[in-house]
């Protein structure tokens, strides 16, 4: 691991433990990291490359951005390194509270389902009785009014 100032290392470790995830663009010349302003992007990339090799984070690379997520081993390591109590967990491990419903319907206004008067034969019309065919013509004998009559066979 390259020589990185201790303040930068601690800032990266604290941010990673607090959030549980870290995103960094693949830009080795970027002066400041987008989320951690006091640290260069190169420092973040180098530290998390080291974390990946020790299996403290899982890495995903997509569209020129690195995405790192802490693993259980990484949480244990950072907890001992930063001397954080067991009660403190990263934001990705916290359960989100269920959102309170802004609108609740009373029992009278709730829909109870179909009323039971659905009749599927209504949509079919009278096709079963041959209503979609011209009168008197059976299957395969359809012709338009303008067409000539079928030739007579002798």
UniProtKB/Swiss-Prot annotation:
Residues 91-154 are annotated as: Disordered. GO terms for molecular function: inositol hexakisphosphate binding; RNA binding; structural constituent of ribosome. It is found in: Cytoplasm. One of its GO terms (cellular component) is cytosolic small ribosomal subunit. The keyword Cytoplasm applies. Its main location: cytoplasm. This is Small ribosomal subunit protein eS10. It comes from Dictyostelium discoideum. The gene is rps10.
């Amino acid at each position: 691991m390259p020589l990185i100032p201790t303040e930068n290392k601690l800032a990266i470790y604290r941010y990673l433990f607090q959030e549980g995830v870290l995103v960094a663009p693949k830009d080795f010349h970027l002066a400041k990291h987008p989320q951690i302003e006091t640290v260069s992007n190169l420092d973040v990339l180098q530290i998390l490359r080291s974390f990946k090799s020790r299996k403290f984070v899982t890495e995903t690379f997509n569209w020129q951005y690195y995405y790192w997520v802490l693993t259980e081993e990484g949480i244990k390591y950072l907890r001992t390194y930063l001397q954080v109590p067991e009660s403190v967990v990263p934001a990705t491990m916290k359960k989100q509270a269920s959102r309170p419903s802004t609108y609740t319907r009373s029992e009278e206004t709730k829909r109870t389902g179909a009323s039971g008067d659905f009749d599927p034969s209504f949509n079919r019309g009278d096709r079963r009785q041959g209503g979609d065919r011209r009168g008197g013509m059976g299957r395969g004998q359809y012709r338009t009014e303008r067409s000539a009559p079928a030739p007579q066979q002798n």
